[in-house]
Amino acid sequence: MHYPVRISNLLFSFIVFVLFFLIQSVNAQISLPEIPSKLTFCGEPVPLDDPDIKERLEKELIINMNKHASTILILKESGRWKSYLQAMLDSATVPQEFFYLAVIESELDPVSRSSAGATGLWHFKESTAKEYGLEISDYVDERRDAEKSTRATSVFLKRAYKKFGSWTLTAAAFNRGTTGIDNALKGQDTKSYYQLYLNEETARYVFRILALKLIMEDPGKYGYNLSPTDYYQPVKYETILINESIQDLPKFAKSLGVSYQTLKEHNPWIQNTDYKLVLTEGKEYKIRIPAKKN
């Protein structure tokens, strides 16, 4: 006669037990990000003692902590790109932390394109790209050449730093333009990015860089537990120098022992037009194909 009551009590206890662990699990998943007490960008302190600055950083951390698919892919792609891009920046005497600028611009996708038409790892617009010596034609788009676009980016950053004397303002200028930042500084009578009233995109820009820097330097702290084998590995390349146009790219690819798809994938600067490549006379270009395994 007492069994149904006992069974009910056991069932109720079991449900409470399950709900407790479900609640604990949800709480763990939606925990707020840890904000460091001190933070720098390229050696320049971020004024986190200002509640507004701390809040702006926290917002970007919350956004990027919860963009699960894109943040995981960024982390995985960093295994392929981080060392390469940081080495190029370092050789140009640009702080390695500007790697995170490429992260927020393109999510480390060399063929990504913004709604404004910017493309490549660093998302150059066409006019700026040409100003910094990158070729864009029906057949070539050097914004999608990792080496050449990183060199162009380094030139821009060094010029901007020479003008502003601040790497933080230099980062903002990459988004807003040097003239835009210069006008804002003069108009608002300040020398600090953190004191500027700016358009929303530029106002968030450095904070997005800082948020991705924090997450990527310690993914586990922000809920992303990747093992070393989860990261995409750098590709080892053989390089072929060319200075003449190619009339049949699939045939050319086959002569190199690769498919046209492989040629295009590893040379995204080649525009997808009628299977040929018309080059500027007297200029040398690099074709990269994956190195053959021994």
Report residues per predicted region.
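Substrate-binding/active-site groove segments that recognize
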Residues: 116-138, 150-152, 157, 181-184
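Short, functionally critical alpha-helical segments immediately adjacent to catalytic or ligand/cofactor-binding
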Residues: 94-111, 170-176, 213, 263-266
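Catalytic and binding regions of secreted/periplasmic enzymes and modules that target cell-wall glycans
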Residues: 157-184
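Primarily a LysM-type cell-wall glycan-binding module
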Residues: 228-257
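Catalytic cores of secreted or luminal carbohydrate-active enzymes
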Residues: 200-223
